[in-house]
Structure formats: C-alpha cells, structure tokens
Design a protein with these regions (language model features):
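Pre-Walker A (pre-P-loop) alpha-helix and adjacent loop at the N terminus of AAA/AAA+ ATPase modules
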Residues: 73, 77-123
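P-loop NTPase Walker A phosphate-binding motif
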Residues: 135-148
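Walker A/P-loop nucleotide-binding motif
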Residues: 120-136
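Interdomain "pre-motor" coupling segment immediately N-terminal to P-loop NTPase/helicase cores
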Residues: 25-76
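Short glycine-rich substrate-engagement loop in P-loop NTPases that contacts/grips substrate
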Residues: 89-103, 123, 145-185
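Loop/turn-to-beta-strand initiation segments
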Residues: 121, 149-150, 186-189, 218-224
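Conserved alpha-helical scaffold flanking the Walker A/P-loop in AAA+ ATPase domains
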Residues: 110-115, 162-190, 206-214, 240
Length: 268
C-alpha cells in the first residue's frame, strides 16, 4: 500500500507541475529532457548494441581522422570507370586485356570487403604509375569507413616520418608516441600508399618489417600499393619482408595506361 500511495503522490505532483507550466504559458513537457536521439536517449546504446546515432558519429570521426573526407567524395566505387582501361590489347604478364584484368581485380576486392569483418586479409596492389592503385585504395577506404572500421591511410613517406618521430623525437611525449604506434599497429586497416618512394635505409626496412609482422600477428589488415616490381621489392627491402608479403598478401597486378595522363589530355 505504501508503494501505491507513493505512486499516487508522484502522479499528483506531476499533474500539479504540468498545470503550473501550462498556467504560465509553457508546454506540459517543458522540463523533460530533450534528446538529440530519441531512440537511445543519447546513451549511444540500445539493448547493449551501438545506436545508429553513435555509428554515424563514429563514421564522421573516422573520416576526419583519415584526412580522406574530401578525396573520398570523388574517389569511390560509384566513380570507378572501367573505360579508362584498354580492351584492345592483351598484356603479356596477365594474358588479359587491362580492362578484363581490372574486372578480376575488382571482383577480388569486393570479395575482400564482404569478408572483412570475419576474415580480414591483406592486399598488395602493384603496377606502373597512374594505373589507378591509389584510386582503388581510396575506394576500399571509403567502403570500410562507412561501416565504422578504423582506417589509417598514409603514404610511405608519411608512415616512415611518423615512425622516425616515435623513435627519435625527444620533444614528442611518450603518450603521443604510444598513441601513434597503437593507431598504426592496431587499426582495422592500414593502407601504405606508394611504397618505395621513401628514402630507403636499414631503419625503414626494420620498421616496415615490424609494422607488417605485428599487424599479421594481430590479425589486422594491411593494403600496400607500389610501383615496384617483385624483383625491386626483394632487392630494395629484404628477403624476409618480401617473403612476409608474398606469403600473406593477395597479390593484385594492375595493368593499363597512365590514367592521370589520359584525364589531363581529356581536360585539354
């Protein structure tokens, strides 16, 4: 009976409060909290699962952190055009026209993306300058960012700059160094673009091996794009780096003409 009396008293006070609000020109629910998201009441979770509002904020944050927001508005699968890849000659290396080769590359990439959450793999995109390797990695990055995966996208120059700072910069706090390394080694996907453009020395080789090996051990996905041939990769780095990549990555050769040059000619 005490609880019934208490409920009745609360109901009475609530009605008095609403009456006072209405009396002074305010809506009856004026003092109730106003939520940005009515579904989760701004907690970010519904029944232990991330609310759609939280997922949206994560995507926005990841885009801002990846430095890719503006680029990905134009470089994504909806803007991918196979017409830039010739179909009037066959490449000796693949036995296919560049267009058919790219179709098969896209099939492999789509399969990679569909299984990413369950079985994250690794890709090596290699081929001549301007054949669309960076464009394709941007397409992949957008797909995964849109699904709230953490994506770190770096040119090889930037990657080794960061690793060098973490190793030798005394002005950089240990907290900042740890955060940077954690981001590089633990993100769902690390994209290393244009491997081979950095100054090569024993430091870059050892750091590259550590990065690749740690991510493999932690089952984190890595995508590398490069203009280097297999022989160049082996010679420039080391046999063990070459072995780690060729044994654990899906190797995708991209053929064709320089698309950037084609676009420049078309614009003029």
């Amino acid at each position: 009976t005490d609880s019934i009396d208490l409920d009745a008293e609360i109901d009475k006070i609530t009605k008095q409060k609403e009456a006072l609000l209405l009396q002074h020109g305010y809506p009856a629910d004026y003092l109730k909290p106003v939520y940005e998201c009515a579904d989760c009441k701004d907690t970010g979770y519904i029944d232990g699962r991330k609310c759609h509002c939280f997922e949206k904020l994560i995507v926005q944050y990841l885009y801002s952190q990846s430095n890719l927001k503006d680029v990905l508005e134009h470089e994504n699968f909806s803007h991918f055009n196979l017409d830039f890849y010739p179909d009037d000659y066959t490449e000796e290396a693949t036995g296919e026209t560049p267009r058919d080769n790219m179709r098969h590359v896209l099939e492999t990439v789509k399969s990679y993306l569909s299984g990413f959450s369950d079985t994250p793999g690794n890709l090596l995109l290699y081929g001549n300058t301007g054949v669309g390797k960076t464009f394709l990695t941007n397409c992949i990055a957008k797909e995964l960012l849109d699904k709230s995966h953490t994506v770190v996208y770096l040119t090889s120059l930037k990657l080794f700059d960061i690793l060098e700072s973490c190793k030798f910069d005394r002005d950089l706090s240990q907290t900042r160094k740890n955060a940077s390394l954690s981001y590089l080694l633990s993100s769902d996907l690390l994209i290393i673009d244009d491997l081979g453009t950095e100054l090569n020395n024993s430091f870059t080789s050892s750091q590259l091996y550590h990065c690749i090996d740690t991510r493999l051990t932690n089952h984190r996905s890595t995508i590398i794009s490069t203009n280097l041939s297999f022989d160049d990769l082996r010679e420039r780095y080391s046999e063990r780096i070459f072995s780690r990549i060729t044994s654990n990555y899906t190797l995708l050769k991209i053929t064709g003409d320089d698309i950037r040059l084609k676009k420049a000619i078309m614009q003029h």
